Structures are given as structure tokens and as C-alpha cells.
């Protein structure tokens, strides 16, 4: 679809009481503005223009960082003077040279709008019969929204703001303005300069385009959302939480319909870019943030948070934090495991209780069951790491690597001082400090020999008591 989406994201958002741009606040781990950009891309818009103003550098980072490699052109245009929504659209048109085709103008704080809604909305002006359509909705509580009054011909007669509604209008006019507009690009470009600023705020308001277009004999109509939630916006932290709950419910219901079990759908927070395989069970307080893929027949949670992580099938992820990790099939993580960026758990491996792994590959069937830190390590298959063992990978300036061969056994409370090399089938005695390579099938022993002194403890206690009597 050769349509342009203009997303208005220049506002201050003062009611959020934040040091950050309103539309940068996250819903299920994703900034609001990215929800809307994604919806326009999925709807088939060929170009997306985000109008920024307040916190411009922050907004550029959010957009450029996420869409630098997008097949759809996504760009930021700065509105240096915030002179209203009409002015913002004019800035976008002039900067991008938009003169034709459907132009969809969306507020940047509508994270629930769907691609299907955007596509249908843009299509209303694609034939040229309508110069503009206004997105409307019928929320359960219309208080605070501008009300739509239609004429006998089905066109918009006027939009009556809440403060201007009579009691009768408030009771009978239940269709509300969602604040989004679709324009015939040629008509918009031809008449955008006719918007005036003769109002209390001396701003240029985009809704004034309705009367301007009608004055030129152009048809203006409405597009009613099938789901009123598509038109809900965020102006406060309370509304942010409310829309987060709606987004959570939508996503969880989708995955339940796809064959995923949720023990308590109100206590699982699945991001919009996550994918979950069938017959996986999601336990309470599970968070999937960013691009997360989970295979089939997994147990996720409770109390787990996965960010930009891939999980295979048949895995157990129990009270685990994983960030930018790859977890293959049949892997057991937790409880209370921490997989940091660069972790790669191969098939059948294990990261157990209070285990931290960073930038390491854990080989097929290898186990790190208890109280260990493994960093900058390549571990072969069939390795067992005893409780309390760590790789000492940092010398105060540089990180160094550890290599543990297949079928090696690392005894409990072992410190492997990197760069360290443990050969295939080697055994490292418990309590060792390993500073030299251990050859294949060798025993590595790096501790002092135990010495027993007969009677020493009894003599020690006797001397303590004598000192107490002095």
C-alpha cells in the first residue's frame, strides 16, 4: 500500500511527570512509539514519518536504533517550534515532500492500535472519493473525549469537545474522536497552509482541516474502530498501567488460542515481539521482553525474565534471568540462574541454582548445577562443574578465556585462573586453584596437602579457658 504514516510524537507529556518523552515509556518492554511504528509497517505503509520535538535526541535513538535496517523507510522530522498538530503535519509534509497518496496521521501515544485498523483506515481515502476520514470509537465511558455529530448525509457535522457538550449531547452522542485522521495526500498538501492560529493558544490545529476541506466541496467522513481500545491513548502513569494490562490480555489470549497454557494470564507479561511454541506452560511472573522465541513443551517460570533470548523445545526455565542468550533443546535453568549476554547453552545442558554464566558456551549435556560463575568460557560436552567453582576471567585490566574439554570433571570449590585450559576427560580436585594447563585425562591438583595434628584442638580449647581465668 503506497501510504504514508505520520506519527505525532513531539509533545511534552507533562502529565506523565517524567524526565523522558511520553511516547518513550514502555508497554511490555517496548516503547509506545515503536508499537505504533510497527503497526503502520505491518499495515503496509511504504513510508513512516515520526514528528519529534521534546527530547529529540532520545527519540532519534529510539527510532533510528530500532529501524535502521527496516525495509520500510522510517524517519524522524523535528518540529523545532511546537505550534500545534496542524503545524506538526505541515513540517512533516514539507520535510518529506509528501504530495499524494493516502496519509494517515496518528498520535504517538496510541500503543494499542493494530495493523488491521491502520490498513482499513488508510484504505478509506485511497480511492479519492473522500478527502479525509476521522477515526472514531465508542468507549464504555466517553467522558473527556470529543463527541462526533454526523449530518444527514453521514458526513461529520462537527466535533464537540467534552467541555462544550450540553447534557443532552453528552448523553446521546456516544461516538468519540480518537484523534487520528486519514487524508487524501493531494488534498492535504493543497490546503494545509489554510489552517489558522486564531485561538487562545495561537496554535495550528489539525482538526480545522475538516472545515477547510468541506469548504472546498470535499467529502469528509468517519472510520469507526471495531475495537474501541485501538483508540485509547496514554496521558498519565495510570493510563500507562491500564493500557499495559489491556496489551497483556490481548497477547496472552492470542497465545492461549495458539496452544500455550498460562497458569494465571494476569501474572504473565509477554512482549509483542515474543513467539511461544505450543504446549509450553507459562507460570506466574514470567516476563518475555524484546525478541524472544520459545519452543514447544517448555516450562517458563515462575519468576523468570527473558530478554532477546532464544529458547528451544523441552526446556525448564525456573526463576531465571536470561539476556541475549541462546538456550537449545532440553536445557534446565534455575532456580535462580542468571544467563548474561553471549551465553549459549547447548542441548541437554544445565545451569542450576545460583549459577551465573556470561559470554560462554556450555556443551551438550554439560552441567553447572550449583553456586558457580562461568565467564568467557568454552566448555565441551559431558562436563560436570562442582558447586562453588568459578572461572577467574578478569585480571583487573583484561578478560581472559577458559577452555574446558569434553567429559572433564571439575571438583567443588575450584578456581580456574584464566587463561585456563582443562583437557578432555581431565579431573580437577576439589578446592584447587588452577593456574596451569591440565592435560587430557590428567588429575589437576592445586591445593596444599591436608595435615592432621593430633590433640591440637583439645590443647587449643584448654589454652582458651586458661586465658579466661586470668
Language-model segment annotations:
Residues 9, 52, 107, 136-137:
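Short beta-strand/turn micro-motifs composed of small residues
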Residues 57, 113-200:
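Conserved core of the sugar-phosphate nucleotidyltransferase
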Amino acid at each position: 500500500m503506497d501510504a504514508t504514516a505520520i506519527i505525532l510524537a513531539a509533545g511534552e507529556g507533562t502529565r506523565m511527570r517524567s524526565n523522558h518523552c511520553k511516547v518513550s515509556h514502555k508497554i511490555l518492554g517496548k516503547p509506545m512509539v515503536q508499537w505504533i511504528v510497527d503497526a503502520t509497517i505491518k499495515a503496509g505503509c511504504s513510508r513512516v514519518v515520526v514528528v519529534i520535538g521534546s527530547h529529540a535526541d532520545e527519540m532519534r535513538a529510539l527510532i533510528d536504533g530500532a529501524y535502521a535496517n527496516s525495509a520500510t523507510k522510517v524517519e524522524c522530522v523535528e518540529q523545532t517550534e511546537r505550534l500545534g498538530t496542524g503545524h506538526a503535519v505541515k513540517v512533516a509534509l514539507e520535510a518529506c515532500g509528501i504530495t499524494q497518496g493516502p496519509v494517515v496521521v496518528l498520535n504517538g501515544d496510541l500503543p494499542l492500535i493494530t495493523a488491521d485498523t491502520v490498513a482499513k483506515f488508510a484504505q478509506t481515502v485511497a480511492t479519492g472519493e473522500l478527502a479525509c476520514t476521522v477515526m472514531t470509537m465508542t468507549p464504555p465511558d466517553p467522558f473527556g473525549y470529543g463527541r462526533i455529530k454526523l449530518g444527514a448525509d453521514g458526513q461529520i457535522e462537527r466535533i464537540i469537545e467534552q467541555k462544550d457538550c450540553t447534557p443532552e449531547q453528552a448523553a446521546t452522542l456516544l461516538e468519540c474522536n480518537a484523534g487520528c485522521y486519514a487524508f487524501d495526500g493531494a488534498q492535504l498538501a493543497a490546503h494545509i497552509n489554510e489552517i489558522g492560529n486564531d485561538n487562545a493558544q495561537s496554535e495550528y490545529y489539525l482538526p480545522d482541516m475538516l472545515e477547510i476541506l468541506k469548504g472546498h466541496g470535499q467529502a469528509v467522513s468517519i472510520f469507526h474502530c471495531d475495537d474501541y481500545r485501538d483508540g485509547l491513548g496514554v496521558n498519565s502513569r495510570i493510563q500507562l498501567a491500564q493500557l499495559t494490562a489491556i496489551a497483556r490480555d490481548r497477547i496472552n489470549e492470542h497465545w492461549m488460542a495458539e496452544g500455550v497454557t498460562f497458569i494465571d494470564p494476569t501474572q504473565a507479561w509477554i512482549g509483542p515481539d515474543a513467539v511461544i511454541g505450543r504446549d509450553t506452560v507459562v507460570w506466574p511472573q514470567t516476563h518475555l521482553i524484546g525478541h524472544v522465541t520459545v519452543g514447544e513443551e517448555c516450562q517458563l517460570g515462575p519468576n523468570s525474565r527473558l530478554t532477546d533470548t532464544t529458547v528451544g523445545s523441552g526446556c525448564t526455565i525456573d526463576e531465571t534471568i536470561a539476556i541475549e542468550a541462546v538456550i537449545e533443546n532440553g536445557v534446565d535453568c534455575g532456580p535462580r540462574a542468571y544467563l548474561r549476554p553471549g551465553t549459549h547453552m547447548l542441548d541437554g545442558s544445565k545451569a542450576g541454582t545460583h549459577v551465573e554464566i556470561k559470554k560462554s558456551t556450555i556443551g551438550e549435556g554439560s552441567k553447572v548445577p550449583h553456586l558457580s560463575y562461568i565467564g568467557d568460557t568454552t566448555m565441551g560436552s559431558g562436563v560436570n562443574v562442582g558447586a562453588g567453582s568459578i572461572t577467574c576471567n578478569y585480571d583487573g585490566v583484561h578478560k581472559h578465556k577458559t577452555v574446558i574439554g569434553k567429559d572433564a570433571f571439575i571438583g567443588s570449590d575450584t578456581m580456574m585462573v584464566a587463561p585456563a585450559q582443562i583437557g578432555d576427560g581431565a579431573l580437577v580436585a576439589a578446592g584447587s586453584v588452577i593456574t596451569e594447563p591440565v592435560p587430557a585425562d590428567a588429575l589437576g591438583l592445586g591445593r596444599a596437602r591436608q595435615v592432621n595434628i593430633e590433640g591440637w584442638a583439645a590443647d587449643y580449647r584448654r589454652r582458651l579457658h586458661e586465658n579466661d581465668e586470668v
